[in-house]
Structure formats: structure tokens, C-alpha cells
């Protein structure tokens, strides 16, 4: 099927198969479609609602265009969609650090914030991490340090082709869903936060289609994280099967605490670091709840409750902050 036929299919409100979505994605990133056609296709999918098959097809395409990290060991990621507009500190990145400190091997994939206060890359840059770490170095850091951060634009340069259209559209597109699933190390284990509840099943089903071994997709009380404030809806993907459930902080042995908010980047960094050091209880608990699920999907623990206990211990004993310092120093040598 040619690209024009795919556009007509979208224009008629029909869903694409995974193979058709792959072809459309290739057409977009290879420059075979003009900006008007790209905008039309992204809008059609957004208005109708992106399907799991379309997301999976786009992810396969994105992986093909990516700069690959040659991982030699299994690793986990905590990348999410972002865009919840909640103004919270960056929990997913801090949680990745804690998970690494507690025994997981982590290849954290992330970007700067496009619309919110603070993205993963903003945090890592603020603490001194070298965002230009290349693929071989990243693989080495995962093995030797247990943590590496890979900056999305460095590893997905082809995405720059569609950036002007994405910026011009007043809504998030399928690329915001694809990014978190397109880790350049092809990780098969991941904690994935989504900003919209409607995306829970879409992303979980796409992860299953993509062959993830163990993924947990979460949306908690208006944030794309496991929430320390109230209930979190979870879709768990394990070897192709999907299970939906809800959890609350107390289910993991955690108190209900507010997720720390920040009004600027400096405050966001300070509160996240205080949480990693165990100096700000609310931040530590919120970070540890997310690290608990990262440790769970990594296979370090058999239950998120055990993961929370392990994560809190890593924070309280200073291991988590030392892991951050180690990772930053290693990225610059």
C-alpha cells in the first residue's frame, strides 16, 4: 500500500495495521511526505485515538532509525510520556538512580521537557551528567556503574525532521507515545508512566505487541508516575499477557504524602536531590514508590512492596545519592 493510500485510510477514520503504521512512520522520517501530509496524518490519529498497533508500528520504525546502544546485559528503563502539567519534581529519573543503587541495571532514556517544568535531561544536565555520552560509553556505564542516561535527540536524530510540525500542532501526537517505548538499547523491561488515563491500555497493548518481557504502565492521580498521593492505575505486561489493577501507597507499605512541586528548575533540582539524600521525606517516598516498580520489572524483587523497602533503604543509607555522583563522574571520563 502506498503512502497516499495510507493517508486516505486515516482520512476515512480507519485504523492502520502495525505494518501500515511502520510504513507511514518511515515515510514521515524519510521526508517522503510534505509537512501538510504529516500534520494531517498525526491529527487524524490523535482525533480518533492512536491504536496499540499504530503505536507498535511507529516504535518499530523509530528503533530502525535510532542510534543503537549495544547493550550486552539486560537493563531496565523508567521513561514515560511526560506532559501531565502537574509541576512535580522529576520522579522517573530519580527513581532510576535509586533502582540502580538497589541492584538494577538501568539505561534511562529521556529528553528535555517540551511543555512542563522539568524533563529527565534537564535534571541530568543540572547535576552535571554529560548528555553527549555515546552508545559504546552508555553500554559500558550500564555494565560498570549500573546506570547510564541516553539523551533522546542524540539517539533519535531522525525525529528532528518532524519537530517543526509537532511544534506547530497544539496537541501531543503519536510521537509522544512512541518516544518512551523506543529506548535505543531495545530494553524489554520498563516502568512507563502515561499522562492520560486513555493511554494506559494503548501503551500496555503496544508493549505486549513489541515483545516486552515485563512492563508496568502507570497513571496516578493526574500524574504520569506512581502516585504517593492516592490511587495509581496499573497495566502490567508480562510475556504477552495484560493485567489491570489499582494500587495505593499503603499497599506497598508507604505513607500517603504529597508529591513535591516546584515553581522553577532550581527548586525542582534541589527537592529531587533532597529526596535522593533522604532529607525531604515526601520526595523520598514518592521516588521510592516509583523505584519499587522499576526494581520489580527488573527482576531484582518479586513484589513491588519489597521494592519499596529496598528503595527506601538505598536512600536512607546514602547509597542512592552516591550512585548519582558515581554516574555523573563516570559520564565525564
Swiss-Prot record:
PANTHER family per record: ANTHRANILATE PHOSPHORIBOSYLTRANSFERASE (PTHR43285:SF2)
Task of the protein: Catalyzes the transfer of the phosphoribosyl group of 5-phosphorylribose-1-pyrophosphate (PRPP) to anthranilate to yield N-(5'-phosphoribosyl)-anthranilate (PRA).
Ligand binding (5-phospho-alpha-D-ribose 1-diphosphate): 80, 83-84, 88, 90-93, 108-116, 120
Cofactor: how bound: Binds 2 magnesium ions per monomer.
Gene Ontology CC entries for this record: cytosol
An example molecular function term from Gene Ontology annotations: magnesium ion binding
Binding site for Mg(2+) 2: 224-225
Needed cofactors: Mg(2+)
Pfam families: Glycos_trans_3N (PF02885), Glycos_transf_3 (PF00591)
Protein name, entry field: Anthranilate phosphoribosyltransferase
The gene coding this protein: trpD
Pathways involved: Amino-acid biosynthesis; L-tryptophan biosynthesis; L-tryptophan from chorismate: step 2/5
Residues where anthranilate 1 binds: 80, 111
The entry's keywords: Amino-acid biosynthesis, Aromatic amino acid biosynthesis, Glycosyltransferase, Magnesium, Metal-binding, Transferase, Tryptophan biosynthesis
EC number annotated for this UniProt entry: 2.4.2.18
Tree of life domain: Archaea
Quaternary structure and interacting proteins, as annotated: Homodimer.
Family that this chain belongs to: Belongs to the anthranilate phosphoribosyltransferase family.
Catalytic activity: N-(5-phospho-beta-D-ribosyl)anthranilate + diphosphate = 5-phospho-alpha-D-ribose 1-diphosphate + anthranilate
Binding site for anthranilate 2: 166
InterPro entries attached to this UniProt entry: Anthranilate_Pribosyl_Tfrase (IPR005940), Glycosyl_Trfase_fam3 (IPR000312), Glycosyl_Trfase_fam3_N_dom (IPR017459), Glycosyl_Trfase_fam3_N_dom_sf (IPR036320), Nuc_phospho_transferase (IPR035902)
Amino acid at each position: 500500500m502506498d503512502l497516499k493510500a495510507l493517508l486516505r485510510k486515516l482520512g476515512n477514520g480507519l485504523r492502520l495495521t502495525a505494518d501500515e503504521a511502520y510504513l507511514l512512520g518511515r515515510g514521515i522520517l524519510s521526508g517522503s511526505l510534505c509537512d501538510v501530509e504529516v500534520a494531517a496524518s498525526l491529527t487524524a490519529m490523535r482525533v480518533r485515538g492512536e491504536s496499540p498497533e499504530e503505536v507498535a508500528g511507529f516504535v518499530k520504525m523509530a528503533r530502525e532509525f535510532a542510534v543503537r546502544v549495544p547493550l550486552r546485559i539486560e537493563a531496565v528503563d523508567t521513561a514515560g510520556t511526560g506532559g501531565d502539567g502537574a509541576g512535580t519534581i522529576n520522579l522517573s529519573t530519580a527513581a532510576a538512580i535509586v533502582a540502580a543503587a538497589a541492584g538494577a541495571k538501568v539505561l534511562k532514556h529521556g529528553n528535555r521537557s517540551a511543555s512542563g517544568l522539568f524533563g529527565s535531561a534537564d535534571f541530568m544536565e543540572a547535576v552535571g551528567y554529560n548528555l553527549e555520552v555515546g552508545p559504546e560509553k552508555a553500554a559500558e556505564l550500564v555494565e560498570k556503574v549500573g546506570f547510564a542516561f541516553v539523551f533522546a535527540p542524540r539517539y533519535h536524530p531522525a525525529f528532528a525532521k518532524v519537530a517543526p510540525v509537532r511544534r506547530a500542532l497544539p496537541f501531543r501526537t503519536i510521537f509522544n507515545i512512541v518516544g518512551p517505548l523506543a529506548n535505543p538499547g531495545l530494553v524489554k523491561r520498563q516502568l512507563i508512566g502515561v499522562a492520560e488515563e486513555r493511554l494506559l491500555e494503548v501503551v500496555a497493548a503496544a508493549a505486549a505487541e513489541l515483545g516486552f518481557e515485563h512492563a508496568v504502565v502507570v497513571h496516578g492521580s493526574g500524574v504520569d508516575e506512581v502516585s504517593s498521593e492516592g490511587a495509581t492505575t496499573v497495566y502490567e505486561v508480562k510475556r504477552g499477557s495484560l493485567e489491570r489493577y489499582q494500587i495505593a501507597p499503603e499497599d506497598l507499605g508507604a505513607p500517603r504524602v504529597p508529591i513535591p512541586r516546584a515553581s522553577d528548575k532550581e527548586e525542582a533540582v534541589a527537592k529531587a536531590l533532597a529526596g535522593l539524600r533522604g532529607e525531604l521525606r515526601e520526595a523520598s517516598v514518592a521516588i521510592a514508590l516509583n523505584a519499587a516498580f522499576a526494581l520489580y520489572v527488573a527482576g531484582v524483587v518479586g513484589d513491588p512492596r519489597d521494592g519499596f523497602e529496598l528503595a527506601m533503604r538505598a536512600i536512607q543509607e546514602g547509597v542512592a545519592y552516591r550512585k548519582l555522583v558515581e554516574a555523573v563522574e563516570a559520564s565525564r571520563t
